[in-house]
């Protein structure tokens, strides 16, 4: 009679998804800091607009700010978790996708800031000392400043991405 074969440990189950690890280099790097600042300034922009009485072209400014706030939030967390390869078609060109996002955001934030500056000037009549009726002048002025800040931050991150691409680097981090 033959001895029983030696017992082998069962094969380890492979997970379909890799483990989540934070990309600390991104978090501490210039693009990670710029993304956080973009999220803060963008939130200030759309919250300031949303809490005031607005109409007309201000709807476009609110749309742009919320859209790019959500897109930036998505880019930030996908890059932070290092899961850009899971994005179909675009994951292999993640640096180019980030630069295109930043340039488009800068262009549309420029238009939104122009709208807010125009609305601020149209409501400047209620900036008088003894004006008692409710007015959106201060909210529009704050939104104009936040929009200009967003525009500058997105231009900076686009410039940073272009510099990385020019140096021959393919990764965001």
UniProtKB/Swiss-Prot annotation:
PANTHER family: MARVEL DOMAIN-CONTAINING PROTEIN 1, MARVEL-CONTAINING POTENTIAL LIPID RAFT-ASSOCIATED PROTEIN. Microtubule-associated protein that exhibits cell cycle-dependent localization and can inhibit cell proliferation and migration. InterPro entries: Marvel (IPR008253), MARVEL-CKLF_proteins (IPR050578). It comes from the Eukaryota. It is found in: Cell membrane; Nucleus; Cytoplasm, Cytoskeleton. This is MARVEL domain-containing protein 1. The keyword Methyltransferase does not apply. The keyword Transmembrane helix applies. Coiled coil: none annotated. Residues 51-59, 116-138 are extracellular. It is a multi-pass membrane protein. Keywords: Acetylation, Cell cycle, Cell membrane, Cytoplasm, Cytoskeleton, Membrane, Nucleus, Transmembrane, Transmembrane helix. The modification N-acetylmethionine is found at residue 1. The chain crosses the membrane at residues 30-50, 60-80, 95-115, 139-159. GO terms for cellular component: cytoplasm; cytoskeleton; nucleus; plasma membrane. It comes from Mus musculus. Residues 26-166 form the MARVEL domain. Pfam families: MARVEL. Residues 1-29, 81-94, 160-173 are cytoplasmic.
């Amino acid at each position: 009679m033959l001895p029983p074969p030696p017992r082998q440990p069962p094969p380890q189950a492979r997970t379909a998804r890799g483990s989540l690890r934070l990309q600390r280099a991104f978090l501490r790097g210039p693009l990670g800091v710029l993304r956080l600042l973009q999220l803060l300034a963008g939130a200030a922009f759309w919250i300031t607009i949303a809490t005031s009485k607005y109409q007309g072209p201000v709807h476009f400014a609110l749309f742009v700010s919320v859209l790019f706030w959500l897109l930036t939030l998505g880019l930030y967390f996908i890059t932070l978790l290092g899961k850009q390869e899971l994005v179909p078609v675009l994951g292999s060109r993640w640096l180019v996708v980030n630069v295109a996002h930043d340039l488009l955001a800068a262009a549309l934030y420029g238009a939104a800031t122009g709208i807010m500056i125009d609305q601020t000037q149209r409501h400047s009549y209620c900036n008088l000392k003894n004006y008692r009726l409710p007015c959106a002048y201060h909210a529009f002025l704050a939104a104009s400043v936040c929009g200009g800040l967003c525009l500058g931050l997105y231009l900076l991150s686009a410039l940073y991405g272009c510099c990385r691409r020019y140096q021959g680097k393919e990764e965001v981090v």
